[in-house]
């Protein structure tokens, strides 16, 4: 199973939010490039970077920092946040991203996703952000009357192969991931799933790893790493156990 440390960017800093709320922000570092280097030195093989300013603004806002992270990291970097046009997507790829996560635009303009997949193939990932089973968009400030699994199936029909699945109610809470919802998404959505939100312990990682045969291929770790619940080395050992 793939373990991806998260670097969430706001105003050029490395932060974490609680359930996606700006007013519930914790600043972990003013030097996200150093943070990226640190995760790679500890064994990270991928990084997951989110442009929070971009998610709220509707267009990437931290491209210079993202490009610097990618140059410094030397490992593949998956980038999301505010990428709502083909132009923005191309800009993030030009900055060096290995994969790009499309969220809001996949709901509001799925034709963009279809074109992106035609051009870039598996470098295009969809972000499925779920609140009580419904899809959330625009930096999680709004929900739409679409079931998350139904949405995943639509994305699979467009040629998407992979999704980052976040249960917003668990994000940043350290309450454990929503295993039932993640299992349902992996079984029924037709996409490979990278799980995100609420992972608090090595046992949580083990539970997600048990879903590998059903399509859960990775986990994104944020607050649990930054708060020291466990080390990245420990997480990588759990992820590799039995592989």
Curated annotation (Swiss-Prot):
GO molecular function: 1-(5-phosphoribosyl)-5-[(5-phosphoribosylamino)methylideneamino]imidazole-4-carboxamide isomerase activity
Claim: Isomerase is one of the keywords in the record: yes
A GO cellular component annotation in the UniProt record: cytoplasm
GO biological process, one term: L-tryptophan biosynthetic process
Keyword terms: Amino-acid biosynthesis, Cytoplasm, Histidine biosynthesis, Isomerase
HAMAP family xrefs: HisA
Family according to the record: Belongs to the HisA/HisF family.
Name of the featured protein: 1-(5-phosphoribosyl)-5-[(5-phosphoribosylamino)methylideneamino] imidazole-4-carboxamide isomerase
Gene: hisA
